[in-house]
Swiss-Prot record:
Top-level taxon of origin: Eukaryota
GO terms for biological process, alphabetical: regulation of cell growth by extracellular stimulus; rRNA processing
Protein localization: Nucleus, Nucleolus
N6-acetyllysine sites (modified residues): K441
Residues carrying Phosphoserine: S238, S240, S362
Record-linked InterPro entries: Brix (IPR007109), PPAN-like (IPR045112)
UniProt KW keywords: Acetylation, Nucleus, Phosphoprotein
GO molecular function: rRNA binding
Brix domain: residues covered: 29-292
Name listed for the protein in its UniProt record: Suppressor of SWI4 1 homolog
Cited SUPFAM superfamilies: Class II aaRS ABD-related
Any one Gene Ontology cellular component term annotated for this protein: nucleus
UniProt-annotated stretches for the region Disordered: 240-264, 323-470
Length: 470
């Protein structure tokens, strides 16, 4: 049998291709789209629709809780490679969209004057075109009328361009372009039009009947006598299926595109179908950092040079105080560490001195040593103390007072009263001295059995004399 599975070179090439795909995917911009505060049902749905526009380079199932702060989101975004935040908020006046560039900013704040959800856009169309395969690739970004009106316009254009991966027009695969995001700037009203379209490429130069035959859904020709009626006159087609093409949407394809009749170097028409959402935006302000920096531009508030200098001085003072607190905290930590090390050295030195003192003093008692070891060094002193106690008191000392002396007395010293009494009994011999120990034991039992029992006290006698009846 032949070798099963892939060869070594195939496995290596496959692993290298997967690694290249992961690296290219990580290099692309990623985004988080979520709401903050009490946004409401419609604004939350708008955030989901905007998240739909940003697919697939966004977190489609992102859930941000009320207790999660913006710092938490920024901390999570770093390891995940997220580069942009799109945050929707709602106030009593209007709805706002914040576009943030991570990790250092800037932050663009837009006011959403008008918006329309995806479901409303789709329901208003007679024939909509939207399927899941369109969202497997990021949309094509088209910026219109972003001229040299000012630095804030250029910054807006750069921010929108960085939201999506760059495209090389010479190497791009046209089959990956299924959607288009159009952002149009109106210099007169200073508003942005946000539109999202579905892209479809169809061949031109064919009749309506031929286009119908090229579609996946075959037309109904039950009323026709011949196929020529469909190709020549287009009988049986509704007026809604008429889509006039012209020079405004006709182009020559540089490569073959998926679809019937879309051949290379042939004329085809590019058709756009809006899939939503729609938004009308107006730039409010531009800030440094992630939402808490200096205001670089404001559409309604204009500050003088003195006010800007005062704001800059206040910020520098705030940064100086922050640095001072950080330095003081670092000094406190260093001082505590030095105190801890000094205390540790002092404790170790004290332990060494105690051990040296214990080793040099033979009379010192070891607290962990057993009692036998404690008294082994001075048995003669305890014997003298016990003898002095006998002479002074006239009684034998307790065993707890002089344990070593008591132990020696039990082993080979003078006998006690009980032991002397046992030795003085007649016929009392030990087991090893030939005495009839068993006979003595039985005799003792028989004598105890013959002992006269004591009279039991009656109930009347046991009572007190004052309660007895006469």
């Amino acid at each position: 049998m032949g070798q099963s599975g892939r060869s070594r070179h195939q496995k290596r090439n496959r692993a290298q291709a997967q690694l290249r795909n992961l690296e290219s995917y990580a290099a692309q911009p990623h985004s988080f789209v979520f709401t903050r505060g009490r946004a409401g049902r419609n604004v939350r749905q708008l955030s989901l629709d905007v998240r739909r526009v940003m697919e697939p380079l966004t977190a489609t199932r992102l859930q941000v809780r009320k207790k999660n702060s913006l710092k938490d989101c920024v901390a999570v975004a770093g390891p995940l490679g997220v580069t942009h935040f799109l945050i929707l908020t709602k106030t009593d006046n209007s709805v706002y969209l914040k576009l943030m560039r991570l990790p250092g900013g800037p932050t663009l704040t837009f006011q959403i004057s008008k918006y329309t959800l995806i479901r409303d856009v789709v329901s208003s169309l007679r024939r909509h075109r939207m399927h899941e395969q369109q969202f497997n690739h990021p949309p094509l970004l088209v910026l219109n009328s972003f001229g040299p009106q000012g630095m804030h316009i250029k910054l807006m254009a750069t921010m929108f361009q960085n939201l999506f991966p760059s495209i090389n027009v010479h190497t791009v695969n046209l089959n990956t372009i299924k959607r288009c995001l159009l952002i149009n700037y109106n210099p007169d009203s200073q508003e942005l039009d946000f539109r999202h379209y579905s892209v479809k490429v169809v061949p031109v130069g064919a009749s309506r009947g031929m286009k119908k035959l090229l579609q996946e859904k075959f037309p109904n020709m039950s009323r026709l006598q011949d196929i020529s009626e469909l190709l020549a006159t287009g009988v049986g087609l509704s007026d809604s299926e008429v889509e006039p093409d012209g020079e405004h949407n006709t182009t020559e394809l540089p490569q073959a595109v998926a679809g019937r009749g879309n051949m290379q170097a042939q004329q085809s028409a590019v058709r756009l179908t809006e899939i939503g959402p729609r938004m009308t935006l107006q730039l409010i302000k531009i800030q440094e950092g992630v939402g808490n920096g200096n205001v670089l531009f404001h559409s309604f508030v204009h500050k003088t040079e003195e006010e800007l200098q005062a704001i800059l001085a206040a910020k520098e003072e705030k940064l100086r105080l922050k640095a001072q607190r950080q330095n003081q905290q670092a000094e406190n930590l260093q001082r505590k560490q030095e105190l801890r090390e000094a205390h540790k050295k002092k404790s170790l030195a004290g332990i060494k001195r105690a051990r040296a003192r214990a080793d040099g003093d033979s009379d010192a008692e070891d607290p962990g040593a057993p009692p036998e070891a404690v008294g082994a060094g001075q048995p003669e002193d305890e014997e003298d103390d016990a003898e002095y106690f006998r002479q002074a008191v006239g009684e034998e000392p307790d065993e707890d007072l002089f344990p070593t002396a008591a132990k020696r007395r039990r082993q080979g010293g003078p006998l006690g009263k009980k032991q002397r009494g046992k030795e003085q009994r007649p016929g009392n011999k030990g087991r090893g001295q030939g005495g009839n120990w068993q006979a003595l034991k039985l005799q003792g039992r028989s004598q105890r059995g013959k002992a006269k029992p004591r009279p039991r006290a009656t109930h009347q006698d046991s009572r007190p004399a004052s309660r007895r009846r006469n």
